[in-house]
Swiss-Prot record:
This is Immunoglobulin heavy variable 3-64. It is found in: Secreted; Cell membrane. The gene is IGHV3-64. GO terms for molecular function: antigen binding. Residues 21-118 form the Ig-like domain.
Length: 118
């Protein structure tokens, strides 16, 4: 299995009331029927996006964080949790500093808040 360093940076990181320079802003919220599909995007700024592996995690209502997927800095290597393998596809566009998660064959248990992380 690949080794991905993960420093939990979600959305706009706030530390001791001071806004950090690193920003990860997700988009792609939607109401989807079971079996449907949805693409999430994460626009990154404040760091050299192409130098970092990137990650998706999620949190279902009333539950803890669940690791979903990761992609290496150049996009050549990917990892998926067993729960999403074969249904979700992670990708990135380093020229746009953007991370994506294409989600397909959606199930009720996929309902969650999704976060991108560096």
């Amino acid at each position: 299995m690949m080794e991905f360093g993960l420093s939990w940076v979600f959305l706009v990181a706030i530390f001791k009331g001071v806004q950090c320079e690193v920003q990860l802003v997700e988009s792609g919220e939607g109401l989807v029927q079971p079996g449907g599909s949805l693409r999430l995007s994460c626009a990154a700024s404040g760091f050299t996006f192409s130098s970092y592996a990137m990650h998706w995690v999620r949190q279902a209502p009333g539950k803890g964080l669940e690791y979903v997927s990761a992609i290496s800095s150049n996009g050549g290597s990917t990892y998926y949790a067993d729960s999403v393998k074969g249904r979700f596809t992670i990708s990135r566009d380093n020229s746009k500093n953007t991370l994506y998660l294409q989600m397909g064959s959606l199930r009720a248990e996929d309902m969650a808040v999704y976060y991108c992380a560096r």
